[in-house]
């Protein structure tokens, strides 16, 4: 019987353990940041253990860094975490992409940009959106602080092999519909737990035609579907992205191995979901979970059709209303889901020549310094700033209420991030997950509009 892509990579990395039981996996790449690593480093000190593979461990500063002034860290806890990471990396000889360097950024953007993320690898990080790296045909997953310490000490991790779920996505995306809409639609249709216990392989003609940026957007939100892992078969698009990166180190042996990374024709998946995207609409979440979303033309559901009726109360919305009825106050373009260069370029098309609505505070946070520099070289920053957007420094920013960038209580925010839980963007904040295009257009109009009809709306 053939093997799935996931099984091939998994089996190659098993050090010990029986099928059906926890197995010890070798870890090829460990990415760390300032929030989940301090206790793990301290654990090494207490046990008087060395860091086993500093050469396979890479760090960046992202969660707590201020995006207005990266060196003026007013929050004492944030300042302590950042300084602690800097000291730990120096002590344990870990490469740190530090504040102010050209390589700093959100961890799930730095890995791919530096060529560290590659097909066939096992990749871990103390962050739940590590599945992002699966877009390259890798097994990538988030871990907790105790597991971070285990990888520090052993370069391995005990894991139970999941089942395999194929999401077969086909058809040409309509104009104005994006990768973000695909993953939001899947979560809306099947819920936030349909991927629990599975590794999700995203395949089909649609996936093959997506860029690496778009593939990363989809894999990034596998965790919102309940899955620990999400991955895509590597191909020429993958190779073109990786080949000239600083840490790519493309050897003939590595390239030959990559050619084997696909699911065999006779591979057996435990479950298959099929999606035709030809009629897909822009998606908008209305509630307090990523599954609480609708297509743009669809009214919000009746109370009896949702899992938590308190969501309407928290969000200040009612059944039967539509996305265009929401009174927005903030727009956030950023996060490890949608802060790559192509996201900002696409969003700028809806902004150029227009002004941010008077009721809107609009913020753009490039996901990395590399993206920021590239965007500025193209004049993208000027388009946003001329329109009235704030153009910030790289970081996780308004994706989570951990740093100074927060949405005021009771205010609705169109956000390109990945989670819309209560308080995710600040106490009382009301988050609506959308594509960069939808967020950008909303900043101009002051409300959500159907970006498929952008020209008609803006010229009306």
Curated annotation (Swiss-Prot):
Q: Which GO terms describe its biological process?
A: L-leucine biosynthetic process
* Keywords of this entry: 4Fe-4S, Amino-acid biosynthesis, Branched-chain amino acid biosynthesis, Iron, Iron-sulfur, Leucine biosynthesis, Lyase, Metal-binding
Kindly give the Gene3D superfamilies that the UniProt entry links to this protein.
Answer: Aconitase, domain 3 (3.30.499.10)
Q: In which pathway does it act?
A: Amino-acid biosynthesis; L-leucine biosynthesis; L-leucine from 3-methyl-2-oxobutanoate: step 2/4
In alphabetical order, the GO MF annotations are:
3-isopropylmalate dehydratase activity; 4 iron, 4 sulfur cluster binding; metal ion binding
| Record's keyword annotation contains Iron | yes
Q: Cofactor: bound how, per the entry note?
A: Binds 1 [4Fe-4S] cluster per subunit.
* Cofactors required: [4Fe-4S] cluster
Which reaction(s) does its UniProt entry say it catalyses? (2R,3S)-3-isopropylmalate = (2S)-2-isopropylmalate
Tree of life domain? Bacteria
Function description: Catalyzes the isomerization between 2-isopropylmalate and 3-isopropylmalate, via the formation of 2-isopropylmaleate.
Subunit field text: Heterodimer of LeuC and LeuD.
The similarity comment for this entry is: Belongs to the aconitase/IPM isomerase family. LeuC type 1 subfamily.
PANTHER family on file? 3-ISOPROPYLMALATE DEHYDRATASE, HOMOACONITASE, MITOCHONDRIAL-RELATED
Q: What is this protein called?
A: 3-isopropylmalate dehydratase large subunit
